[in-house]
From Swiss-Prot:
Pathway: Metabolic intermediate biosynthesis; chorismate biosynthesis; chorismate from D-erythrose 4-phosphate and phosphoenolpyruvate: step 4/7. It catalyses: shikimate + NADP(+) = 3-dehydroshikimate + NADPH + H(+). One of its GO terms (biological process) is shikimate metabolic process. Belongs to the shikimate dehydrogenase family. It comes from Chlorobium phaeobacteroides (strain BS1). Homodimer. SUPFAM superfamilies: Aminoacid dehydrogenase-like, N-terminal domain, NAD(P)-binding Rossmann-fold domains. This is Shikimate dehydrogenase (NADP(+)). The lineage of its organism: Bacteria, Pseudomonadati, Chlorobiota, Chlorobiia, Chlorobiales. It comes from the Bacteria. NADP(+) binds at G130, N131, G132, G133, A134, M230, G253.
Length: 293
């Protein structure tokens, strides 16, 4: 008798580059679980509600959500976890018999790679590039799990950054939050930690510019910094290359990807992701891709 697998997937726009299917299918296969993870490309924000209604009808078990829909899906949820409600962004959805529950595991994906550097971050300014759902998760992670002296938000349009700052200040954020423009290189240089929470530098994403969020000749990056790039394809982005060239600590987006994926996997399946197996298999895949490119 045929036993249907439970379907999981990634909601996003032009996300064929994602390693999430490989990660989750590797984990499910290792544990012998009846899940299959795929990609659901949605072309525009206005199609998201009907897509999620269709998912309810089809009995799709759950989703990850990526750029640009982490905020869009919030209004479609029947319930929100405390962390998703706190930041107004969802990256993980559970379909519980037609009830959609939104979570945010990006926070875990940010905290886990940064934990070894907590003492470096303590009482020092930190910076985040971006004003979307990933940036919101970074603000929440840094303000609740670490003790920086302040969080600087670097954005292209200052009014959007100011709006985000107001949103967090209304929640009595325990750490000062300020808005700066992308060309404020002095403020960036003085940050102990810089996080790229934008898609800039992503390979194969038509909507994101190539290159680095920090220009190589800007003098921003130095050996006393931690550079965390949420972009994971390519594994070594131009920003991470710049970090390594200047002696800064470089944290690749793959670490965040695995961190948030492991938490999502546990929410869906009730099982701990076999992280060592997943990391080893992913590294093998990346090495193969690098050789063939």
């Amino acid at each position: 008798m045929y036993s249907a697998k439970k379907i999981l997937g990634l909601i996003g726009r032009n996300v064929g580059y994602s390693y999430s299917p490989y990660i989750h299918n590797t984990a499910a296969e290792k544990l012998g679980l009846g899940y299959y993870y795929t990609i659901f490309n949605i072309s525009s924000h206005d199609l998201v509600p009907s897509a999620l209604e269709g998912a309810k009808a089809l009995g799709i078990a759950g989703f990850n959500v990526t750029i640009p829909y982490k905020k869009t899906v919030v209004a479609c949820m029947d319930k929100l976890s405390p962390e998703a409600e706190a930041i107004g962004a969802v990256n993980t959805i559970v379909n519980d018999n037609g009830t959609l529950i939104g979570y945010n595991t990006d926070i875990a994906g940010i905290v886990i790679p940064l934990e070894p550097y907590a003492s470096m971050i303590d009482a020092q300014p930190v910076g985040i590039f971006g004003n979307g759902g990933a940036a919101m998760a970074a603000i929440e992670a840094l303000s609740t799990c670490f003790t920086p002296s302040g969080i600087r938000l670097f954005v292209r349009q200052r009014e959007k950054g100011s709006e985000l700052c107001r949103q967090f200040k209304d929640k009595n954020l325990p750490i000062p939050l300020s808005t700066h423009t992308l060309d404020d290189h002095t403020a960036q240089h003085n940050c102990r930690l810089l996080i790229n929470a934008t898609p800039i530098g992503t390979k194969g994403l038509d909507t994101a510019p190539a290159g680095s969020i920090i220009p190589s000749g800007s003098g921003v990056v130095h050996s006393g910094q931690i550079i965390f790039d949420m972009v994971y394809n390519p594994v070594e982005t131009q920003l991470l290359q710049l970090a390594k060239a200047t002696g800064a600590i470089a944290i690749p987006g793959i670490e965040m990807l695995i961190g948030q994926a492991s938490r999502s996997f546990e929410i869906w399946t009730g099982k701990a992701m076999p992280v060592t197996t997943v990391r080893n298999k992913l590294q093998e895949l990346l090495l193969t891709e690098k050789r063939s490119s």
